[in-house]
Every structure is written in structure tokens, then in C-alpha cells.
Amino acid sequence: MFHSIDEAKGELVRTVARLCAAAAVTAPKSGGQLFLRGKPLFIETVFIDGRETLARLARWMRQRGRERRQAIWLRDAALAESLDGALFIGLKDWYPPIYDCGACGFATCAEFMEATRQRRAESDLFEFSGPHCNLRDIDLGIAVGSAAKAASLYSVDTRCQTRIAVAARKLGLIQSEVAVALSMTVTHKNPGFDARMPAADFDVRETARDLPTGTMPIKTPDGRWQHRPDLEPEE
């Protein structure tokens, strides 16, 4: 028995998150025959609902917003703090479907994987690493959509977001190379929509500044742009 939805929604959201994860895993994917031959799952699902962890995500996002002078990160940071939970769905240890479709610009999957091997390794410090197989990115979108549909069947409000997923990846909460966060709430109004952009004065110094996020593009001596967590961008 419960006397208020507040008493029940923690367990409710966790249960629905499990069902959403199942929907993401069982969603259609390219190269289904490869699974029948023993290939492993490449969809990662991680659920987070702890208030301290959600606050960590929000702090990272606020610092990211200050670094880039982008208020939208501050808006989504406030949203992260208000969530009942977030289900992260991403591509981890993916492999191509061996369709040789050419959508990546290469004639074969093998050629694409070999030609981009070094770039994928070097981009691991980026907010998301890449490049990816286009079909696998489509698979990720289908998985996220399937999860959102499952949540809607049980009247849990969601919104698909990438900024919270970036924070989770950079904080080591998920291992995916690219991911989407399915924010989950049980409230009178879905807080993921219609939130106003906060007023922000980026010229005011914070009294207690967090460490740099390491996501500011910095031009290296060889003329390339990199995300260097060991360097702080010039003012």
C-alpha cells in the first residue's frame, strides 16, 4: 500500500527502466544474422537514479556550459537534478553489419574499419568518439525510440537527450562511444519540455570553479584540433 505517488515512483521508475532497457536490446538491428552466429551485444544500457550521481552530472554540465558560454548546458543541468532517473543507451564495442553498403563513404565495411582505426582511437577523448558505421548509429536511434515507446506505455515521461549522455561518458559512468540519455520522470508536467533558457552571466567568475571538462577544442602544433584534458584553453 502507498498513500502518495512519491512513495511509489522510485520503484516504479526503476521497474520501467528495466523494461525500457529490454526494449532497447531487443529492438531491430542491422546484421541480425551475426547475433545468431554468436556475435556479442553492442548496445549498452545503464540506469542512474541516485541524487548524488545526478548532481555530479549537473555540476559537470554547468562547467561545460560556462566553458563554451552556452546556456543550454545550464538548462539541461537543472533538468538533470530534477529527474527521477536516467537510462543511458549507447554503442559499446560495436562492429559493422558487413553489408558493404557504402553509406560511410567506403566500398566495404573492412576498408572503413581499417581506414578509421587510428581516428577512432584518437577521438576517445572527445565528448563522443568516432567515426561510426552509419547503420549502427541508425540502430542506436531505433533502440532509443523503442525504449521511449516502452516508457510511454507505462505513463513515465521521458525525453531523449545527448548532453546528459556526454556528461555520463566523460565522468566514466558509461563506456559507450556514443550514447543518448532517456530522462525519466513521474510528475504533473514533463520537465524535459518547455523549460526556459536560464539567464547566465558568463563573465562573472565562479567562487568555487570545478576542474576543466577537457572538452574545449585546442589547436595543436601540427594544426589539428583536439580535446585535451591536460590543457586549459586560453581566455
Regions found by a protein language model. Give the residues of each.
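Acidic, surface-exposed loops and disordered segments
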Residues: M1-E235
